Amino acid sequence: MPSKEGSGCRRWCFTLNNPTDGEIEFVRSLGPDEFYYAIVGREKGEQGTPHLQGYFHFKNKKRLSALKKLLPRAHFERAKGSDADNEKYCSKEGDVILTLGIVARDGHRAFDGAVAAVMSGRKMKEVAREFPEVYVRHGRGLHNLSLLVGSSPRDFKTEVDVIYGPPGCGKSRWANEQPGTKYYKMRGEWWDGYDGEDVVVLDDFYGWLPYCEMLRLCDRYPHKVPVKGAFVEFTSKRIIITSNKPPETWYKEDCDPKPLFRRFTRVWWYNVDKLEQVRPDFLAHPINY
């Protein structure tokens, strides 16, 4: 029998007869964030009617009205059986067009959910918040799994903002007020605690990272940074560098500053009490090319 609206449910199955190309593409485009597990197979009924047979196990309860907004023509019912039962039923004809997450074993829902979150590339802080008990028991193992498979290598140009000016003018405050999660890199080799934050802040910088390392950090190619006992992918979208000194003075004369300047996206200067973006033609070398 079709489900009544009720208070919502996490586990739903559905049938969608004669699916259109648009409906099939929509199903294929679904992402992992909302689901513990999902599977959709393409089948033909006894009368030859093509249809989609699907199963959704959401992380949060969903009402029928919300599901109808996703697939208005589908017939939804509250699911019976386990994830494994529904996996078998929806894949019986072998033409599976969507699978998300992993099938949970009985009594291990939280653990399997945490593993699935790590496998999908979620940040460890997010995994710890969503599965705190699992993290307390298996945090080291989840971290090791994340190091092996969790993060995809960088495939984009990390933006680099340089802001310099006299002490006490507000550079650090400006960096802290920028949007996104932040990792403050301390002096030294290690990046312990780095979890792919949106922004890396190099505060009060004057060349205390090796020049070749700075070039790699500020570039667009895959790069790993060291944590105790391992290396992790550097995936931050933005680097903010604050300094009392202009960037052309950070490194010795035998380090050509031009490659580093080329990686800068924007350069800022505190003029008295006003922050101004420096015009590229006023800088010692060209930037952002």
From Swiss-Prot:
Enzyme Commission number(s) from the entry: 2.7.7.-, 3.1.21.-, 3.6.1.-
Protein location: Host nucleus
UniProt motif Nuclear localization signal: location: 4-13, 60-80
Binding site for ATP: 165-172
GO biological process, one term: DNA replication
Cofactor binding, per record: Divalent metal cations, possibly Mg(2+) or Mn(2+).
Keywords: ATP-binding, Covalent protein-DNA linkage, DNA replication, DNA-binding, Endonuclease, Helicase, Host nucleus, Hydrolase, Metal-binding, Multifunctional enzyme, Nuclease, Nucleotide-binding, Nucleotidyltransferase, Transferase
One annotated Gene Ontology cellular component of this protein: host cell nucleus
Motif range (RCR-3): 89-92
Catalysed reactions, semicolon-separated: ATP + H2O = ADP + phosphate + H(+)
InterPro entries on file: CRESS_DNA_REP, Helicase_SF3_ssDNA/RNA_vir, P-loop_NTPase
Residues the record lists as binding a divalent metal cation: 43, 51, 93
Active site: 89
Pfam families listed in its UniProt record: RNA_helicase, Viral_Rep
Recorded family membership: Belongs to the nanoviruses/circoviruses replication-associated protein family.
Known partners and oligomeric status: Interacts with the capsid protein; this interaction relocates Rep into the nucleus.
Domain notes from UniProt: There are 3 rolling circle replication (RCR) motifs. RCR-2 is probably involved in metal coordination. RCR-3 is required for phosphodiester bond cleavage for initiation of RCR.
Function text: Essential for the replication of viral ssDNA. The closed circular ssDNA genome is first converted to a superhelical dsDNA. Rep and/or Rep' binds a specific hairpin at the genome origin of replication. Introduces an endonucleolytic nick within the conserved sequence 5'-AGTATTAC-3' in the intergenic region of the genome, thereby initiating the rolling circle replication (RCR). Following cleavage, binds covalently to the 5'-phosphate of DNA as a tyrosyl ester. The cleavage gives rise to a free 3'-OH that serves as a primer for the cellular DNA polymerase.
The name this protein goes by in its record: Replication-associated protein
Organism lineage: Viruses, Monodnaviria, Shotokuvirae, Cressdnaviricota, Arfiviricetes
